[in-house]
């Protein structure tokens, strides 16, 4: 790689930024390749980034790269838009829920159009996620990776649309998890882990009962942490008993989470994520779908 991940501290001063940084409202804070000065450092810190990408000495190829699955503009604006959609879906007002569903469908259409399956560079959508926006930024990335996989396995347009909606909603139930657990800066204890895991059931139940979301889409909320070898949750399902949509989204969800910076653990590189899926530990996932996903990094 032509960039490296560095914890946000004074050591980044004078280095070149390895990715565009945006404010919570989507405005550009600092462009890729810009030298990080004291003013920039303080602003980035104020916005809430915990680590950043810095370019290595020879960074000209990175600046010319076009391997992003989705545009910088959409990556900046979509999380805030999705946050608004979630709020509408959580409303008890039928009109707000209906509007939220329409906006969600529009977002799914936009993401599908943006993902370029014929790219010559490996897909690159790792983002520097602000803690308070992590859920929404993660959902956008999961959707983009899921689209990539779904296109690779030759999904027709309707199935592609469904799996995109499912990916955008897979962590909807996180809204019903205590924020102290959700944003805890250290590893969770066993009781907290059990509470966190309830998001699968809570999301499935709410979307089905209150939003009348299509059954197969809501099922992904329930199943996206199930594992092919039976080691997942909440029902310890295995193999083809797990719906294929869920098997696709589970890989996308894992890969983005694994390559994201979290308060309680360091960010892993794309290479480390790939190696995890290749090793025996990767047996948690459908091997056929894993092969489709990894083919984009070869």
Predicted regions and their residues:
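Terminal helices and disordered tails flanking the catalytic cores of nucleotide-processing hydrolases
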Residues: 1-108, 122, 266-298
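A short alpha-helix capping/helix-coil boundary motif
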Residues: 18-22, 124-126, 182-183, 225, ...
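Short, contiguous strand/loop micro-motifs
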Residues: 26-29, 133, 190, 232
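Signal for well-folded cores of large energy- and translation-related assemblies
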Residues: 45, 116-120, 147, 173, ...
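Acidic/His-rich, divalent-metal-binding segments that scaffold phosphate/diphosphate chemistry
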Residues: 60-197, 204-211, 215-216
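Alpha-helical scaffolding flanking metal-ion-dependent phosphate/phosphodiester catalytic sites
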Residues: 165-177, 188, 193-205, 209-290
């Amino acid at each position: 790689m032509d960039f490296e991940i560095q914890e946000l501290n004074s050591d980044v001063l004078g280095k070149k930024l390895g990715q565009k940084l945006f404010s919570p409202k989507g405005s550009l804070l600092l462009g890729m390749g810009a030298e990080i000065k004291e003013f920039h450092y303080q602003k980035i810190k104020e916005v809430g980034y915990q680590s950043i990408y810095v370019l290595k000495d020879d960074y000209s190829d990175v600046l010319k790269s076009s391997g992003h699955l989705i545009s910088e503009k959409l990556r900046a604006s979509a999380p805030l838009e999705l946050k608004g959609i979630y709020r509408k879906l959580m409303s008890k007002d039928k009109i707000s829920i209906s509007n939220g569903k329409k906006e969600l469908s529009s977002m799914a259409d936009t993401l599908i159009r943006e993902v370029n399956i014929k790219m010559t560079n490996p897909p690159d959508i790792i983002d520097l996620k602000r803690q308070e926006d992590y859920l929404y930024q993660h959902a956008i990335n999961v959707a983009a990776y899921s689209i990539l996989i779904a296109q690779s396995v030759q999904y027709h347009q309707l199935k592609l649309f469904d799996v995109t909606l499912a990916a955008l909603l897979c962590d909807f139930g996180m809204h019903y998890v205590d924020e102290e657990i959700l944003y805890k800066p250290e590893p969770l204890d066993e009781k907290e882990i059990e509470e966190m895991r309830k998001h699968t059931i809570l999301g499935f139940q709410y979307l089905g009962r209150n939003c009348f979301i299509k059954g197969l889409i809501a099922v992904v909320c329930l199943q996206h942490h199930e594992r092919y070898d039976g080691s997942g949750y909440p029902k310890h399902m295995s193999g083809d008993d797990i719906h294929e949509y869920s098997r696709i989204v589970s890989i996308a969800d894992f890969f983005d989470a694994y390559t994201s910076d979290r308060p309680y653990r360091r960010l892993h590189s794309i290479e480390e994520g790939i190696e995890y899926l290749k090793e025996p530990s990767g047996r948690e996932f459908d091997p056929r779908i894993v092969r489709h996903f990894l083919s984009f990094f070869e």
